[in-house]
């Protein structure tokens, strides 16, 4: 079974099959990005995060982002996965990998994919704190950036 080029997962992200799926003989560069759940934000101690996703729309838009990146940066392949549900500190919330003939294209393509995911996907993040009530945090796509 082939891996999807973009996916939303309620399970921890296993990067090894993703990296293996990106391997191709024409590629001279692999660049990956992993966004982790950190233990602080805006001076508050974060206990965990919760992501809610409009899944169908997010997947459709995610595939568009991957296609755009492949065309714009001449990538041989690109894959991205974003988590949904409740995540603990240190867990991977989002993972992006791209391959290209040269490193500059792979770096630029990876940055494009993560930037567009944060900008365009209907994903909402709620931070759970130790000493404060849980709060939904700013999402770029709600503000017409």
UniProtKB/Swiss-Prot annotation:
GO terms for biological process: Mo-molybdopterin cofactor biosynthetic process. It holds the Pfam family MoaE. InterPro entries: MoaE_sf, Mopterin_biosynth_MoaE. One of its GO terms (cellular component) is cytosol. Transmembrane segments: none annotated. To M.jannaschii MJ0717. PANTHER family: MOLYBDOPTERIN SYNTHASE RELATED. This is Uncharacterized protein slr0903.
